[in-house]
Regions:
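Short beta-alpha junctions and helix-cap segments that line functional grooves
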Residues: 1-3, 21, 71
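A generic helix-loop boundary/linker signal
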Residues: 5, 25, 64, 128-131
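A beta-strand signature from Gram-negative outer-membrane beta-barrel systems
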Residues: 5-56
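Outer-membrane beta-barrel signature, preferentially recognizing the C-terminal barrel domain
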Residues: 18, 169-179
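Alpha-helix N-cap/helix-start motif
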Residues: 24-28, 67, 94-95
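Periplasmic-side early beta-strands and strand-to-turn transitions of outer-membrane beta-barrels
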Residues: 43-44, 51-52, 56-58, 62, ...
Length: 179
């Protein structure tokens, strides 16, 4: 599955795109290009500010595929300490094409929704295996002193399904834990 499909957009601080052959400093072993995704830097209170508290909430809905999701983040920081949480969930059913694009399979007598797999039917404008469901959580802690920064992030991703339309390589019940 495409590597960027694992990312929660609300946790991305910056994206860098290298077209063509990438420099050795960013991997260097790609021919068609590289995309570098970086998480957001920790936030600290300004000198003399005391403590900093901030949060963000968002949601989306797209009618095609009934796609929906939400994200939440919260940060508490002083001049030298920062703790943050980000969480997001997203899911979608199969999406629909702009019109009927599938022909009847295996003869004129078949149900128009027949897919070639017994007991499985899709409408003629439905793009099969495009559904997904994912949940992401990250807890970050950082300490800053002078020009030094110590940062740790704990992450958990639960991806019950990420289907793949052009290959039979659907991902089911994938769980990732990272430090």
């Amino acid at each position: 599955n495409p590597a960027l499909s694992y990312l929660d957009p609300s946790q991305v601080g910056a994206l860098k795109v290298y077209a063509g052959i990438a420099p050795v400093s960013v991997g260097g072993d790609s021919i068609g290009g590289s995309i570098i995704a970086e998480t957001a830097e920790p936030v600290f209170a300004a000198p003399g500010q005391g403590s900093l508290v901030r949060g963000e909430a968002g949601a989306f809905y797209r009618s095609n595929g009934n796609a929906r999701g939400a994200n939440l983040s919260a940060t508490y920081a002083t001049e030298s300490f920062s703790i943050s949480y980000t969480g997001a969930t997203a899911q979608s059913d199969n999406y629909e094409a702009g019109g009927n694009f599938k022909e009847r399979l295996f003869g004129a007598g078949n149900d128009p929704a027949f897919t070639g797999r017994p007991g499985h039917a899709l409408s003629r404008d439905e793009v099969g295996s495009t559904a997904y469901e994912t949940r992401n959580h990250t807890l970050g802690v950082a300490f800053r002193g002078g020009s030094h920064l110590i940062e740790a992030k704990l992450g958990f991703q639960d991806m019950p399904e990420q289907l793949w339309p052009n290959q039979r390589m659907d991902m089911l019940d994938n769980v990732q834990q990272r430090l």
